[in-house]
Amino acid sequence: MRAVTRSRSQLYSSMLTPLLFLVFLGNGVSEGLAPANLTAGNFTAYLVAGVVVMTSVFSATFSSASYYKDRDSGILRMLLSSPNSARTVLFGKSLAGVCIGVLQGSVVLLLAAPFVEFEWQYGVLPGLGVALATIVLLNIMLSGLAQALASRVETMQGFHLVMNLALFPLLFFSGAFFPVDNLPMWLEVLARINPLSYAVDALELAAYADGTAGFFGLAVDFAVLTVLAAAVYALGLARTPRLTWSGK
């Protein structure tokens, strides 16, 4: 975590990019181009859930990319030669990534809240609690996925390519930028099998959608996110990291 806080360019860019996306796209589309049947009062408010998920995606990618710096500098080999097990080392690194992602996602949500029309159907504090729990589960899942990929993809460039190829299509078909109900059947199927859809839906229900407006429902959202977070995070910890280009 200290390395990320010292890298101001990484810290600021991973938070400012989603916020700028929210400001310019939200205000631009709100002027006459907003999709119908929004669960929020306006398109800017609707985008907040997707922007928080986008922040978590950026954070997981950037945090896990530090694996390559540690590997190439010999730090990872030194850590793995310590009395601690490989899983303990990976747990510490991934936990730091989870904490950073949760912090950044929460900051984006809190910065956006005063400027958009949130309904807080459960009340402000319970709504924030639901949103925070969603952000935590989302970042656990993303951190596990990023850790599993980083331990197998040889180069940082390849890692970023695989992460972008895997996550950005999921982000676009998650309801982050347009409602997923009343879409063609094949898009609705993609939304239902998309893990990010459940995070977006839970954040929408926490902040501005009423109880009947959620695509899946809060209970289903948390059940899916909890199972996926546990399974994917366990997979990330189970992958033995490669220390050399040959994989040894």
Regions found by a protein language model. Give the residues of each.
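Hydrophobic alpha-helical transmembrane segments of multi-pass membrane transport proteins
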Residues: 20-24, 43-115, 146, 165, ...
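Short helix-capping/hinge motifs at transmembrane helix termini and TM-loop junctions
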Residues: 25-34, 58, 112-121, 153-155, ...
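Short cytosolic juxtamembrane segments of multi-pass membrane proteins
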Residues: 240-248
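Aromatic- and glycine-rich beta-strand/loop motifs that create alpha-glucan
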Residues: 1-17, 245-246
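Alpha-helical transmembrane segments and their short interhelical loops
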Residues: 86-163, 213-237
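Residue-level recognition of transmembrane alpha-helices
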Residues: 14-15, 47, 51, 70, ...
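Pore- or pathway-lining transmembrane helices of multi-pass membrane proteins that form conduits
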Residues: 11-20, 154-175
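Membrane-interfacial helix-loop-helix junctions in multi-pass membrane proteins
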Residues: 35-39, 121, 171-231
